[in-house]
Design a protein with these regions (language model features):
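Long, low-complexity, charge-biased intrinsically disordered regions
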Residues: 1-177
């Protein structure tokens, strides 16, 4: 297999659906793989969204759900040295990035939001989550994402102040529109 051409954790053209094609006769293999990938998200931030996406199909795994798992494994094989490392850099600027995808789920039309918080050049917090309710507009989804990341930043800033880690204020949050 050629592992050099996998530059993203999931194929962006593939949209997985819940009830397509035939169910796997034994979904144990799929569940074990996704469970191990879920554990790996503790150190591989780049696969968090992909694993969250694949985890939705644990209870009713179908044949098309296996291909993205193997794609993700091949992506991991491309550069096994990637991970989360704390930089020695003394730049303690706290900044955050957030993004949302409105009505992305083809089955439920629910949206997905995520954020990534950095202290200097080191990742300190991240999250990717499918919303429990349907949003009426993309603006509503973006505001929800901003609310989540600001809540996380308030918590982190209080934690860092308690640990006497000084960082410049105000904290910058980057969000697309």
């Amino acid at each position: 297999m050629d592992y050099n051409n996998f530059t993203s954790p999931l194929d962006p053209t593939v949209k997985l659906k819940a009830k397509e094609e035939e169910a796997l006769t034994d979904p144990t293999y799929y569940r074990k793989l996704v469970g191990k990938l879920n554990f790996l998200t503790n150190t591989r931030l780049d696969i968090a969204y992909s694993v969250q996406n694949l985890s939705q199909f644990m209870d009713d795994t179908r044949q098309p759900h296996l291909k993205p798992v193997f794609h993700l494994l091949r992506y991991l094989k491309t550069d096994p040295t990637l991970g989360i490392f704390m930089s020695r850099d003394t730049n303690y600027t706290l900044r955050a990035y957030c993004d949302s995808d409105w009505a992305v789920c083809p089955d439920s039309r629910n949206s997905i939001s995520g954020y990534h918080v950095l202290l200097g050049s080191s990742s300190v917090s991240w999250k990717s989550k499918k919303h429990a309710t349907i949003s009426l507009s993309s603006a509503e989804v973006e505001y929800r994402a901003l609310r989540k990341v600001v809540g996380e930043l308030v918590w982190l800033s209080r934690l860092f102040e308690e640990l006497t880690v000084l960082f410049p204020k105000p904290i910058v949050v980057f969000c697309d529109s």
